[in-house]
Amino acid sequence: MTWYVIDGMDGSGKSTAGRFVKDHLESEGRSVLEITHPTEHRVVGRIADRFLHMPGGKFWELLAALFYILDVVASLFYVRRVGKNYDDIIFVRYSMAVAYVPAGLVPLTYRIVESVLPVPDVKILVDIEPEIALERILFRGESLESFETPERLAKVRRKIMMISDGWYIVDNAGSDISLREQLLAVLRSEVMA
C-alpha cells in the first residue's frame, strides 16, 4: 500500500490534484481510498468546516484547528481498520494545516506533527500564487473561510514553503493539463524509486 498526501493552501487545487492521482492509479487497476479533510461525512469534519466560516477570528480558528486534528486522527484510525482493503490511500489535506498557526510556531509545530502522526509515503504540495488561489476560491461561489483573503493566503503560502522540504512541489498556476503532467512525473518517479 502506498499512502499519498496532497496538500497546499486554500484554492491551490488540492482536490483537483487528488482526483487526478486517484483516477490515474485506478486506471492502472489499483484500488484507491481518497479522504478529503475536513471530511463532510464525519461530525468532527463538519464542525471544523463550520468553525472556518465563523466571523470573529482567532477563537473560531483555534476551534477549527482542534476539530481538524480530530478529523485527521479519525481518518488515521479508519485507514488502520480498512486500509488493507486498498492498494493506495490518498489524503487531501494533512500536515500542511500547521501553516495556519502563527509564523513563529510553524517549524516547531510541523516537527511535532511529523513526529507524532504517521508520515505518508509520498507528499505532494500543490503550490499557487495567492492571487490565483483567491480567484479560484471566488469562482467556486462558496462562502469564504476566515483565511481566504489575499493577505492571509500570502502569509500561509510563505509558511508552507518554510516547511516544504521533502515534498514534491507541483505548480498549479497553469492548466489542468500542466498539473496532470507534473503529478504524473511525481508518480513515475515514485514507481522508479
Where are the model-predicted features located?
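Generic enzyme active-site microenvironment
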Residues: V5-G8, I90-F91, D127
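Glycine-rich phosphate-binding loop of ATP-dependent small-molecule kinases
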Residues: M1-A64, V119-V122, D165, S175-A193
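ATP-dependent small-molecule kinase phosphotransfer cores
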Residues: L33-R111
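Anionic group-transfer/hydrolysis microenvironments
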Residues: M9, Y94-S95, A99-Y100, E129, ...
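Short, well-ordered beta-strand core segments
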Residues: I89, K123-L125, I169
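A glycine- and Lys/Arg-enriched "phosphate-lid" helix/loop adjacent to the NTP-binding pocket
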Residues: V98-V101, L105-R158
